[in-house]
Structure formats: structure tokens, C-alpha cells
């Protein structure tokens, strides 16, 4: 299933490359402006309330889902849909730790209005290895759709924005979940090349050993 998905994606990427080659009169500045307009339009059309980082912190790092709040952090708009901080087994990724997370996601091109990829209906989730180095997070994919689709282990840096604020649990009914509006500068290699923003809906589940590790 992943192989067929990747083949289709590769064809679409080649068509996109052909389009860019035929439309090379468009400048990078114009592409960025088009991206900004797409994000602003998406925010307006979906009734998203953007709050400041200061308000986010003052509210205990909570975004009110009922009010459709997103907080902007370094160009990424983040909505924390569920943060299982009160779960009995809730843990954060501590300084110096590296852990594997199981990830379910949906990737939506805001500019074109199309779903690019998803593993929601796949048999296995994607896996990503995340490291906390003094509050700076880095990650690599170790398996899954994203790794196969983009032929790289690189995790979009925008995906790491929530890690400083989230708690994690293995309970499938209480997984950490976020919605992210990610600009091309913090997105996939394709997003960076063709300059488009994406909406990601992502759940994170730590690998089993994470819950039982000793301090």
C-alpha cells in the first residue's frame, strides 16, 4: 500500500516540478506572499482565533479548542487538542532523553486545498525518534509513510513545536494530539521547494518502554 502511495506521490511531484519550470517567472517573494495569503485566508475561513505566546503561557500552555484557538510560535500555528498531563502515566520527554514515538497524522496542503498524505488508515503508524537537548528538540523518522513518501528520515521542524509543552501517555483514548499550520520554512522538502503551507493533525504515542522507564 505504501509503495503504490509513493508512486502516485512521485508522479504528482514531477508534475509540480514541470509546472514550476514552466512558471519560473514567479519570484520567491511572490510565492511567499501567496503562501501568507493562503494561511490568512484559511485562518479567516475556519474561524481560527490566534492568541499570543504570552497569553498561551499565562493560560498554562492551553489552547481553547471550543474557541478554536491557535498560538503562533516562530511562524507555526499550534492548537493543542489534547494534552494528557493529568494521566497517571503521563510523562514529558526530559532533557537528554531520546525516545521513539508512534505517530498518526494527516497532511493537508492549505494552498491547494488537498490532502497530500495520511497514515490514519494504514496498518502501522509512522515511527520517529525524538531527542531533547536542553529544550531544543530534534527528530528522525525510522519507518512509515512520511519516510517512504519523501525518501528521507528528516522530520519537519514544525512537527517538533509541541514537544516542549506536551505530556505523553500510551492510552489510546487519551493520546497527545495537536493541529499545526506549518509554513514551508518548517515543512517537508517538497513544501520548502514549492513554497506551500500545510495543516497537520497529529497524535503522538510513546513506545511501550517509555512508560516503564525509571527516572
Regions found by a protein language model. Name each.
Residues 1-22:
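Sec-dependent bacterial lipoprotein signal peptides
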Residues 2, 22-215:
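Cross-family detector of peptidyl-prolyl cis-trans isomerase
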Amino acid at each position: 500500500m505504501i509503495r503504490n502511495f509513493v508512486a502516485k506521490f512521485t508522479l504528482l511531484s514531477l508534475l509540480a516540478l514541470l509546472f514550476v519550470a514552466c512558471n519560473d517567472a514567479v519570484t520567491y517573494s511572490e510565492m511567499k506572499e501567496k503562501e501568507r495569503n493562503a494561511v490568512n485566508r484559511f485562518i479567516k475561513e475556519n474561524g481560527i482565533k490566534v492568541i499570543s505566546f504570552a497569553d498561551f503561557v499565562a493560560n498554562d500552555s492551553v489552547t481553547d479548542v471550543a474557541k478554536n484557538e491557535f498560538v503562533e510560535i516562530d511562524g507555526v500555528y499550534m492548537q493543542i487538542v489534547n494534552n494528557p498531563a493529568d494521566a497517571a502515566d503521563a510523562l514529558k520527554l526530559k532533557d537528554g532523553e531520546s525516545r521513539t514515538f508512534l505517530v498518526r497524522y494527516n497532511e493537508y496542503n492549505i494552498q491547494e486545498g488537498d490532502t497530500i498524505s495520511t497514515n490514519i488508515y494504514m496498518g502501522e503508524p509512522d515511527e520517529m525518534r525524538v531527542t531533547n537537548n536542553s529544550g531544543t528538540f530534534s527528530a528522525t523518522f525510522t519507518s512509515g509513510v512520511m519516510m517512504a513518501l519523501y525518501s528521507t528520515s528528516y522530520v519537519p521542524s514544525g512537527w517538533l513545536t509541541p514537544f516542549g509543552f506536551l505530556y505523553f501517555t500510551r492510552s489510546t483514548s487519551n493520546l497527545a494530539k495537536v493541529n499545526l499550520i506549518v509554513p514551508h520554512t518548517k515543512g517537508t522538502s517538497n513544501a520548502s521547494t514549492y513554497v506551500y503551507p500545510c495543516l497537520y493533525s497529529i497524535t503522538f504515542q510513546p513506545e511501550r518502554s517509555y512508560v516503564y522507564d525509571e527516572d
